[in-house]
Amino acid sequence: MVSLEKNDRVMLARQLPLKSVALILAGGRGTRLKDLTNKRAKPAVHFGGKFRIIDFALSNCLNSGIRRIGVITQYQSHTLVQHIQRGWSLFSEEMNEFVDLLPAQQRMKGENWYRGTADAVTQNLDIIRRYKAEYVVILAGDHIYKQDYSRMLIDHVEKGARCTVACMPVPIKEATAFGVMAVDESDKIIDFVEKPANPPAMPGDASKSLASMGIYVFDADYLYELLAADDKDDASSHDFGKDIIPKITREGMAYAHPFPLSCVQSDPQAEPYWRDVGTLEAYWKANLDLASVTPELDMYDQNWPIRTHMESLPPAKFVQDRSGSHGMTLNSLVSGGCIISGSVVVQSVLFPRVRINSFCNIDSAVLLPEVWVGRSCRLRRCVIDRACIIPEGMVIGENAEEDARRFYRSEEGIVLVTREMLRKLQVKQER
């Protein structure tokens, strides 16, 4: 382990990102989000009133000084590719800056699609090698968080690691969805189990497990060796969490990086923010958290901005209808191009170009772009997918049995409405 002086750290914070390439794994379907990902990959799902989920990983790279980025795509990639082409074309080719889109190459052993997360990188190795990076930062494209990857790179170098895994404590009942690790006093990973049925608890805290965040830093040459060996292993599932990280752990070459060391937050006393919005309830809740008085995730931090594709839209408008009812909102996010006419919106998130007509009550709802809500509707605890037209007088979120019959209702009572569901409902009513 190398002990670095403050001046050395400042220098490395500038140099290491320039020697690195980031690979964002963005091919996941996100089946737990149900119909919300039927026509888009999970990283392309809308979030926070104006963003896409992948904007967080991309913005973290940009803010950390990593300007060479590969985005590995697969499932329903058109929306994702279009978003990146329109919103992330700010890099300078003359300065060797880029965002490369890397689809499934469909050339390894006759496979059409990626066999696992590690295979997604393996299939693109010939392209990745051309980047001539010393370090490879591998990221999930479907998490909400702010992280300075340069700090993680410094930790990687300081510990003399060949592989570094970002980690944070999670409630033990949720740890079955993550890779869970045990570490020694030097943060060396001494045990790693992917999605265990009975997650081991952290020493001194039986209520939590130490979970992998799916964020890795590798020495580039070491990663290439690992992937070449894994590709030849017919018994492997070709996955970082299931195969690569356990192998490195057995070899004693993997170290943990505690997320608080690199988490970017305005309030240093706050809990580090990282969300895997993989379920409908988690997605709904993370969106509504941003509309609270003091959100856990600060989206107004000018020192760490989250970028996205910006459309030229007029400001949101709140108008009085002909009967004299005022358009009002409280504790909500309302994006450009929205019009609220004679209705009340409370604790909700409205994406661009949402139109709410008179006499509506919108409470704890997430309305994606171009949603049109007819007069006298009541929407509560729901997510309305893009371009849905909610008929006049429709009530959602008040009758569990009716919601489950017409739409998708989660066990927690969150209702998802899509255009296809509304179309089927209309056909049924016309019979």
Swiss-Prot record:
GO terms for molecular function: ATP binding; glucose-1-phosphate adenylyltransferase activity. The keyword Metal-binding does not apply. AMP binds at residues 40, 46, 52, 130, 370, 386. InterPro entries: ADP-Glc_PPase, ADP_Glu_pyroP_CS, GlgC_bac, GlmU/GlgC-like_hexapep, NTP_transferase_dom, Nucleotide-diphossugar_trans, Trimer_LpxA-like_sf. Keywords: Allosteric enzyme, ATP-binding, Carbohydrate metabolism, Glycogen biosynthesis, Glycogen metabolism, Nucleotide-binding, Nucleotidyltransferase, Transferase. It catalyses: alpha-D-glucose 1-phosphate + ATP + H(+) = ADP-alpha-D-glucose + diphosphate. Beta-D-fructose 1,6-bisphosphate binds at residues 39, 419-423, 429-431. GO terms for biological process: glycogen biosynthetic process. Its EC number is 2.7.7.27. Belongs to the bacterial/plant glucose-1-phosphate adenylyltransferase family. Homotetramer. This is Glucose-1-phosphate adenylyltransferase. It comes from Salmonella typhimurium (strain LT2 / SGSC1412 / ATCC 700720).
